[in-house]
Design a protein with these regions (language model features):
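Secretory N-termini
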Residues: 148-150, 156-159
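Beta-sheet-rich sandwich/jelly-roll-like modules and their strand-loop junctions
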Residues: 40-116, 158, 164-231
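Solvent-exposed serine/threonine-rich low-complexity stretches and specific carbohydrate-binding patches
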Residues: 124-138
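Short aromatic-acidic-glycine turn motif
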Residues: 115-123
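Exposed aromatic-hydrophobic patches
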Residues: 141-151
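Bacterial Sec-dependent N-terminal signal peptides
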Residues: 1-25
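Solvent-exposed, conformationally flexible loop/turn segments
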Residues: 138-141, 156-157
Length: 231
């Protein structure tokens, strides 16, 4: 059974934060290719002159001690991330995030960037080529970094930067193929085959798979986008 686990510490905190806990469910739908919505990125080949400076795009919110989300091998395709915003043209150089631990062998994550038009309730993937990150087995917290394989410019606007669980060891996937039949003892014995991310109290989006739409949630995973801002 697919699971998106948020530990009880966060659940308690969200119960106290009524303004967050009572936030209505919001779903964004993918913009069609002929959509007139202003959701776009700038062309790769454009060269920008004038003032520029190094900058980080981050909108993490409050880190809640002990709060984390866990993915297991049956969560392939699931996404979670952070929303960032730029007021000027921005060239992405790297994207970083923390992993608390990982027990899944040969785990591969990919990063996509979705331009958001929250007024029209739409989003659009602006990347031609996703960024991939191979995650080693980890017993302690580690920062991971992904780099674009091509020039990536963002127009002024809001973006959902998402991490997706893409692939893992074939034998591990086979082990998890019948997990709906497991009893509690079996599930507990397999629980080490999971990856854990820290969570921050600031709204973002998630979705269970590429065929699903983005759904707003009151937490994010604290991604940081580093690059060059042009003015």
């Amino acid at each position: 059974m697919k699971r998106f686990v948020i530990v009880s510490v966060l659940a308690v905190l969200l119960g106290v934060c009524n303004a967050v806990a009572q936030e209505r469910t919001v779903t964004l739908k993918a913009a069609s290719s002929d959509s007139t919505a202003r959701i776009y990125a700038l062309p790769e080949a454009v060269v920008y002159s004038g003032k520029k400076k190094s900058k980080k795009l981050a909108n993490k919110g409050v880190r809640v001690a002990g709060a984390r989300t866990a993915w297991t091998p049956d969560n392939l395709g699931q996404e979670i991330g952070s929303v960032v915003e730029t007021g000027n043209i921005f060239r992405v150089q790297e994207i970083s995030f923390n992993v608390m631990s990982n027990g899944i062998e040969d785990l591969k994550l990919c990063i996509n960037i979705y331009a958001l038009n929250e007024e029209k309730m739409q989003y659009c993937n602006i990347m031609h080529t996703p960024m991939y990150v191979e995650v080693p087995v980890l017993s302690a917290k580690q920062e991971l970094t992904a780099y674009p394989t091509e020039q990536l410019f963002l127009a002024p606007g809001r973006y959902f930067v998402a991490v997706r669980m893409t692939d893992c060891d074939a034998a591990v996937k086979e082990q998890w193929s019948d997990n709906t039949m497991w009893d509690n003892r079996k599930r507990y014995s397999m629980s080490k085959q999971s990856i854990h991310f820290p969570l921050y109290l600031k709204s973002s989006y998630t979705r269970k798979g590429i065929a699903d739409e983005l759904e707003k949630v009151p937490v994010n995973m604290g991604l940081t986008v580093k690059g060059i801002e042009y003015r």
